[in-house]
């Protein structure tokens, strides 16, 4: 028995441990980390790991990606495989993407409200920008300290496998989708057809006042043609109308009153000509009745 029996037994035990199997590809929606995300936003686990990670379990998520991928982007070539390419060891790794772009990491996540910020489809244009290259396999015994490196390598291998099979993905989701105007702006256009037919060309609907409302409005208008803000609110609350409806009604009523006033003035002017002539004639008679005395005085004074 050698002196380093315990060390040899640990090494043999580690090498005989089966490699963690990759998760099977799910036909459902896949979520990806956007390539344009700056490095500070990509969280790396150099301290605590994924909270859902257990002993012997395999977790492929953005939180389990270490900063090793970012530091080795310039030295390790981009890796991508075809349909028949596979990973030969637990330490096999490949960095997908160019030297200036972040790797595209694939993981199976449950649907959550926060998942809406990731595009559920892969743009096929990325496949043309990343030509396939040779795999770089690194065979090394798995040690307890290299668990994070193994997770990163498996994530990169999954990304390479995902890039090698573009036919399994859903239709393209381009960036122009986010340039579409907010659909909430067209909320009025998506309403029922009855509303659109009642308001053609954006015209305001005519308010149908009841007889009680018209009576109260006419009574208030006869006492005061111009309302204050407080009085307008009181009338609107009392008649179950809006302040704008009361304001518009009084505006229209004042215009109507002016038109009626102009019409009555014209009619009065036409009748005043006769009346005025009669009055003028009466005044002339009064003047004539008073004129003889003055005329006699003038006649009496005139010979002098």
Curated annotation (Swiss-Prot):
UniProt DNA-binding region: 202-261
Assigned keywords, A-Z: Cytoplasm, Developmental protein, Disease variant, DNA-binding, Dystonia, Homeobox, Intellectual disability, Nucleus, Transcription, Transcription regulation
Low complexity compositional bias, start-end: 141-151
InterPro entries, A to Z: GSH1/2, HD, HD_metazoa, Homeobox_CS, Homeodomain-like_sf
Comp. bias (Basic residues): 123-140
Keyword Electron transport recorded: no
Any single Gene Ontology cellular-component annotation: chromatin
One term of GO molecular function: sequence-specific double-stranded DNA binding
A single GO BP: regulation of cell migration
Ranges for region Disordered: 116-151, 283-304
Pfam families associated with the record: Homeodomain
Subcellular location: Nucleus; Cytoplasm
Organism domain of life: Eukaryota
Protein's job: Transcription factor that binds 5'-CNAATTAG-3' DNA sequence and regulates the expression of numerous genes including genes important for brain development. During telencephalic development, causes ventralization of pallial progenitors and, depending on the developmental stage, specifies different neuronal fates. At early stages, necessary and sufficient to correctly specify the ventral lateral ganglionic eminence (LGE) and its major derivatives, the striatal projection neurons. At later stages, may specify LGE progenitors toward dorsal LGE fates, including olfactory bulb interneurons.
Family per record: Belongs to the Antp homeobox family.
Disease implicated: Diencephalic-mesencephalic junction dysplasia syndrome 2: An autosomal recessive neurodevelopmental disorder with onset at birth, characterized by severe global developmental delay, hypotonia, spastic tetraparesis, generalized dystonia and severe intellectual impairment. Brain imaging shows a unique brain malformation characterized by agenesis of putamina and globi pallidi, dysgenesis of the caudate nuclei, olfactory bulbs hypoplasia, and anomaly of the diencephalic-mesencephalic junction with abnormal corticospinal tract course.
Protein name: GS homeobox 2
Species the sequence originates in: Homo sapiens (Human)
Recorded name of the encoding gene: GSX2
């Amino acid at each position: 028995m050698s002196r380093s029996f315990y060390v040899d037994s640990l090494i043999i035990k580690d090498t005989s441990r089966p490699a963690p199997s990759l998760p099977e590809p799910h036909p459902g929606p896949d979520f990806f980390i956007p390539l344009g995300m700056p490095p500070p936003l990509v969280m790396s686990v150099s301290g605590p790991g994924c909270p859902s990670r257990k002993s012997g379990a395999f977790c492929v998520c953005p939180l389990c990606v270490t900063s090793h991928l970012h530091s080795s982007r310039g030295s390790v070539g981009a890796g991508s495989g075809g349909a028949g390419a596979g990973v030969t060891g637990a330490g096999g790794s490949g960095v997908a993407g160019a030297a200036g772009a972040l790797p595209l990491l694939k993981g199976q996540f449950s649907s959550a409200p926060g998942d809406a910020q990731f595009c559920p489809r892969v743009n096929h244009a990325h496949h043309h920008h990343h030509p396939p290259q040779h795999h770089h396999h690194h065979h090394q015994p798995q040690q307890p300290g290299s668990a994070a490196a193994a997770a990163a390598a498996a994530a990169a291998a999954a990304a390479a496998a995902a890039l090698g099979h573009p036919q399994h993905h859903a239709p393209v989701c381009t960036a122009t989708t986010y340039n579409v105007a907010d659909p909430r702006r067209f909320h009025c256009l998506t309403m029922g057809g009855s509303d659109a037919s009642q308001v053609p060309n954006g015209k305001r609907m005519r308010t149908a006042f009841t007889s009680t409302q018209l009576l109260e409005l006419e009574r208030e208008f006869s006492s005061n043609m111009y309302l204050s803000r407080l009085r307008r609110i009181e009338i609107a609350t009392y008649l179950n109308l809006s302040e704008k409806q009361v304001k518009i009604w009084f505006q229209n009523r004042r215009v109507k009153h002016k038109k009626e006033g102009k019409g009555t003035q014209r009619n009065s002017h036409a009748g005043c000509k006769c009346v005025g002539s009669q009055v003028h004639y009466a005044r002339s008679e009064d003047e004539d009745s008073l004129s003889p005395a003055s005329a006699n005085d003038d006649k009496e004074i005139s010979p002098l």
